[in-house]
Amino acid sequence: MKAQELREKSVEELNTELLNLLREQFNLRMQAASGQLQQTHLLKQVRRNVARVKTLLTEKAGA
């Protein structure tokens, strides 16, 4: 997910995206803890996407 794609979304869409990412992050962490996760790079990707969305929400709140 690119930052430019996220910038085009509204605050409501960003909140929905954040909720989906947090759910995905939780599921990935559970898979990793149980040893079922093969693609460990997904944890890093999702964590950074969460940070991107939170950053944009903060920017939009200030503007």
UniProtKB/Swiss-Prot annotation:
Keyword Ribosomal protein belongs to the record: yes
Keywords: Ribonucleoprotein, Ribosomal protein
Pfam families: Ribosomal_L29
Gene Ontology biological process terms in this record: translation
MF-aspect GO terms: structural constituent of ribosome
InterPro entries: Ribosomal_protein_uL29 (IPR050063), Ribosomal_uL29 (IPR001854), Ribosomal_uL29_CS (IPR018254), Ribosomal_uL29_sf (IPR036049)
Gene Ontology CC: one annotated term: cytosolic large ribosomal subunit
Similarity comment text for this entry: Belongs to the universal ribosomal protein uL29 family.
UniProt protein name: Large ribosomal subunit protein uL29
